[in-house]
């Protein structure tokens, strides 16, 4: 049995719904096709989100990302479509998708798209003093 690409995103219940925490994912092998030339475009996607009630299931995300391999789409459009589909599936408190497309015609393209759940406000950051570097020997 072979695994096939799919546009269906699956989720699971967020195990810690009482706390804001960030989930960070890196997807280094995204591919789609240039809608003008049909040539492949390659990108590294970085996904950061703060879940609410649902988290994205990794295998379904992999198959979803894979589904773009043979689709012709502009960088801006595909980044926003992926973000929109993730928002529909998870309804996160916050989500940011960064697409860093590799050079094409001497130009690198980066697209950043974000969504915030209505009424959600991030907690203020906590800045802690850093400690001096520790060594396992004393002088």
Swiss-Prot record:
A GO cellular-component term linked to this record: cytoplasm
InterPro entries: GTP-CH-I_C/QueF, NADPH_dep_7-cyano-7-deazaG_red, QueF, QueF_type1
A GO molecular function held by the record: preQ1 synthase activity
Active site: 34 (thioimide intermediate), 41 (proton donor)
Main EC class the enzyme belongs to: oxidoreductase
Pathway info: tRNA modification; tRNA-queuosine biosynthesis
EC number, UniProt record: 1.7.1.13
Family affiliation: Belongs to the GTP cyclohydrolase I family. QueF type 1 subfamily.
Role this protein plays: Catalyzes the NADPH-dependent reduction of 7-cyano-7-deazaguanine (preQ0) to 7-aminomethyl-7-deazaguanine (preQ1).
Official protein name in the record: NADPH-dependent 7-cyano-7-deazaguanine reductase
Organism, scientific name: Nitrosomonas eutropha (strain DSM 101675 / C91 / Nm57)
């Amino acid at each position: 049995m072979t695994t096939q690409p799919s546009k269906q995103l699956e989720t699971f219940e967020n195990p810690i719904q009482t706390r804001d925490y960030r989930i960070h994912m890196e997807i280094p092998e995204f591919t789609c096709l240039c809608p003008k030339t049909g040539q492949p475009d390659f990108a590294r996607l970085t996904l950061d989100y703060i879940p609410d009630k649902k988290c994205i299931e990794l295998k379904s995300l992999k198959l979803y990302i894979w589904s773009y391999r043979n689709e012709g789409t502009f960088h801006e459009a595909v980044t926003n479509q992926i973000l929109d589909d993730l928002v529909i599936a998870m309804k996160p408190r916050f989500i940011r998708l960064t697409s860093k497309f590799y050079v094409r015609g001497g130009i690198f393209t980066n697209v950043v798209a974000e969504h915030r759940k209505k009424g959600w406000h991030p907690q203020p950051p906590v800045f802690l003093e850093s400690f001096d570097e520790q060594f396992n020997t004393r002088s």
